[in-house]
A protein has these predicted regions:
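C-terminal membrane-solvent junction of multi-pass transporters and transport-like membrane proteins
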Residues: 125-128, 320-332, 366-417
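Membrane-interface loop-to-helix entry segments
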Residues: 128-179, 235-236, 358-368, 395, ...
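Helix-loop-helix junctions that connect adjacent transmembrane segments
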Residues: 23, 27, 105-128, 156-286, ...
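A generic transmembrane alpha-helix motif of multi-pass inner-membrane proteins
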Residues: 24, 356-357, 361-362, 375, ...
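Membrane-interface "cap" regions at the ends of multi-pass membrane proteins
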Residues: 1-24, 37-42, 51-54, 382, ...
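Select transmembrane alpha-helical segments in multipass membrane proteins
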Residues: 1, 66-79, 132-134, 194-207, ...
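Loop-to-transmembrane helix boundary motifs in multi-pass membrane proteins
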Residues: 126-134, 225-229, 233-246, 263, ...
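Hydrophobic transmembrane alpha-helices that form the core helical bundles
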Residues: 15-18, 30, 37-137, 142-145, ...
């Protein structure tokens, strides 16, 4: 659960309320996003039980479509998705920490410079928030270099803390006399239009950002006990629990904050807490948000670095990335590289732009990973599968179709950022053929 419950649920409900102005549509988009996530989780669960090696989707794509596709996934996942998400979430952590230490929120940069890439303006600036974000990433790097047991303990602790914070907010809201069920009206729009379809698509992208991380448990499968049994169970029950939790949180937000006011909130969870709990309650909720964001950062290090480690161990990338620390038995080179690159990305300080890259790259490979179930049933029909995908092939094909729609919608609605994501992915190919040539020699 820690891989999914990050900063999104504390940020994106306000943006979704700005796209969809009726509570029924907001509930619908969260349910559909959760169902898609569940379909994907149930699909990936078969792959993780079939091929329970460390590396997750890298291994699935390599066995299904060839080594180059596994490598491209690892590149995208490591340098764009994981590092970009870590940078954005670390900046969010530092921003919320500024509630308790206002001096950390100073917006005057210590240094800055600007440039453009394919017409996209980029500012590199070191402010107090970026400096704290770098320190947080450094701490998470050191924790995970020390070993899976320590990193896993930290993840479990912060998962419990943030779930308790969300549950406390839900209970406080619905037992308060300060809410109003009239805030749920209008429940449904008077008519459906082309503009509403576009808005629903944009809201869905925000929802899927909040559900990001559902595959990460499979990527440390080689280091887990009994992965054939534990991974499918974790995906199924964890995803269902998060769907219910997210729906309850959104209903709680809207119960105390009207939709037209919700869309203008930058700290929706804190604002909801302030209505029913006052300043002290706001402090508690922000403490929960800090636990949530740090737990997500730590979990990404714990699981996501394994894909590039698998590529290094497979000689599809620099062999240094496949090295294991002699004492701690962790992929320390990969973890340190991820920490350094993520820390550098915090200098951009752009949460929204990074999210666009992450969603586009993620769902391209999520769709291919789901297709791997079909391919591997043809290529490996006799290999034992302790778990088989539920409602196959219908749930799998629905998920693949949804991934295709998300890519199309991103290309149409946010074409510039989507093209930048494609270019960044294609940059990986020269490196692949270089390392492949060196290995063959």
């Amino acid at each position: 659960m820690s891989a999914i419950i990050g900063s999104g649920i504390f940020v994106v409900p306000a943006a979704i309320a700005g796209h969809l102005h009726s509570m029924g549509l907001i509930v619908l988009v969260w349910v559909l996003g959760g169902v898609l996530t569940l379909f994907g989780a149930l699909t990936v669960a078969e792959l993780s039980s079939l091929l329970p090696q460390a590396g997750g989707p890298y291994v699935y794509l390599r066995e299904s479509f060839g080594r180059v596709w596994g490598y491209m996934f690892s590149w995208n996942h490591f340098f764009i998705n994981t590092a970009g998400s870590l940078a954005a979430i670390a900046v969010a952590f530092a921003t919320y920490l500024g509630y308790f230490f206002p001096s950390l929120s100073l917006q005057v940069p210590l240094f800055s410079f600007s440039f453009s890439v394919l017409g996209l303006p980029i500012e590199i600036a070191l402010r107090g928030t970026q400096l704290i974000a770098m320190i947080v990433i450094l701490i998470a790097t050191l924790i995970n270099v020390r070993g899976v047991r320590l990193g896993g303990w930290v993840t479990n602790f912060f998962t419990a803390a943030k779930v308790l914070a969300l549950l406390a907010l839900i209970v406080a809201v619905f037992t308060s006399t300060k809410g109003n069920s009239a805030n749920y009206l209008p429940w449904w729009p008077d008519h459906w239009s082309k503009e509403l379809t576009s808005a629903f698509g944009l809201a869905m992208i925000s929802v899927l950002w909040s559900y990001e991380g559902w595959t990460t448990v499979t990527q440390s499968a080689g280091e887990m006990k009994d992965p054939e049994r534990n991974i499918p169970r974790s995906l199924l029950f964890g995803t269902l629990a998060i769907i219910v939790l997210y729906l309850a949180v959104n209903m709680a937000y809207a119960y105390v904050i009207p939709l037209d006011q919700m869309s203008g909130s930058s700290r929706i969870a804190a604002d909801a807490a302030a209505v029913v709990l006052g300043p002290f309650g706001t402090s508690l909720i922000i403490a929960g948000i800090l636990c949530s964001t740090f737990g997500t950062i730590n979990n990404s290090f714990l699981s996501d670095a394994r894909s590039m480690y698998a590529a290094g161990a497979d000689n599809s990338f620099s062999p240094s990335f496949g090295k294991i620390h002699a004492r701690y038995r962790t992929p320390h080179v990969t973890l340190i590289a991820l920490g350094v690159w993520s820390a550098l990305l915090t200098l951009s300080g752009s949460y929204d732009q990074i999210a666009s890259y992450v969603i586009f790259g993620s769902w391209m490979f999520y769709g291919l990973t789901a297709l791997s179930v079909i391919v591997l049933r043809k290529k490996m029909p006799d290999v034992p599968r302790p778990y088989r995908a539920w409602a196959y092939p219908y749930a799998t094909l629905i998920f693949v179709g949804a991934a295709g729609w998300i890519l199309y919608n991103t290309l149409v609605e946010d074409s510039r950022d989507a093209m930048i994501g494609i270019v960044l992915l294609l940059i990986s190919l020269p490196f692949y053929f270089y390392w492949k040539g060196r290995h063959e020699k």
